[in-house]
Curated annotation (Swiss-Prot):
The keyword Transport does not apply. The lineage of its organism: Bacteria, Pseudomonadati, Pseudomonadota, Gammaproteobacteria, Aeromonadales. It comes from Tolumonas auensis (strain DSM 9187 / NBRC 110442 / TA 4). Keywords: Ribonucleoprotein, Ribosomal protein, RNA-binding, rRNA-binding, tRNA-binding. PROSITE patterns: RIBOSOMAL_S13_1, RIBOSOMAL_S13_2. This is Small ribosomal subunit protein uS13.
Length: 118
């Protein structure tokens, strides 16, 4: 298994698909990384030589991925909560942040129903 950005990417998959196992790398970014590294999209990871894997590592290293990205996202949410703005309050209360209705839906964000005690 090739190790890129601290993640073991699967050997049996195509390079583009395998790169999406890294948090912060989606389909579009994986294609641009492969193009910049000069690697065809249909090549499997097990068929890459060490120089090509190193080229992928350098291209992935140009982006914010994995732990740094997770930390950045959580710090952004924490900043909103500390500011006390509307979005921060919604995060703090565990409710939808982007204006969705909450009277009937929003079960994913609110969690399972709590029975009313009589």
């Amino acid at each position: 298994m090739a190790r890129i950005a601290g993640i073991n990417i699967p050997d049996h998959k195509h390079a583009v698909i395998a790169l999406t196992a890294i948090y912060g790398v989606g389909d579009t970014r994986a294609k641009s990384i492969c193009a910049a590294a000069g690697i065809a999209e249909d090549v499997k990871v097990k068929d890459l030589d060490e120089a090509q894997i190193e080229a992928l590592r350098t291209e992935v290293g140009k982006f914010t991925v994995e732990g740094d990205l997770r930390r950045e996202v959580s710090m952004n949410i924490k900043r909103l909560m500390d500011l006390g703005c509307y979005r921060g309050l919604r995060h703090r209360r565990g409710l939808p942040v982007r204006g969705q209705r909450t009277k009937t839906n929003a079960r994913t964000r609110k969690g399972p129903r709590k029975p009313i005690k009589k």
